[in-house]
């Protein structure tokens, strides 16, 4: 299910709001520290490998991936999601592993649509 949501989010980023953009920006927020950090690090390595394999492109567009460590904390996830959407101006936020973190940020994404 998480993989499906990630694929949908990336697909949406490539079609909505980026039609005239030169680069699609993806905020990849995942758990990179603590005991569960190994999962997020493996995901980060997979994303980096895929980007290398695809020549830094998503759907034929240049892509920039901004990684962020949510520390598996809902309050940190909210702050990071806000920063990624407002300051970094990402087209999509992906990579969230834990449902409690997704629940913490899902309303923010509706505000920024």
Language model features by range: what are they?
Residues 44-67:
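Signal peptide-proximal N-terminal region
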Residues 63-87:
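Structural motif
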Residues 28, 84, 88-97:
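Periplasmic-binding protein-like
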Residues 111-113:
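Conserved small/polar residues in nucleotide/adenosyl-binding loops
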Residues 7-15:
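Bacterial N-terminal signal peptides
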């Amino acid at each position: 299910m998480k993989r499906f949501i990630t694929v949908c989010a990336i697909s949406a980023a490539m079609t909505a709001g980026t039609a005239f953009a030169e680069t699609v920006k993806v905020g990849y927020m995942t758990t990179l520290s603590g005991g569960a950090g190994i999962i997020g690090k493996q995901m980060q390595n997979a994303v980096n490998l895929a980007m290398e394999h695809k020549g830094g492109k998503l759907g034929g567009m240049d892509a920039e991936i901004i990684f962020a460590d949510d520390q598996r904390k809902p309050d940190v996830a909210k702050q990071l999601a806000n920063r990624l959407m407002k300051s970094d101006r990402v087209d999509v936020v992906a990579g969230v592993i834990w449902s409690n973190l997704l629940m913490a940020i899902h309303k923010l994404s509706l505000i920024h649509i």
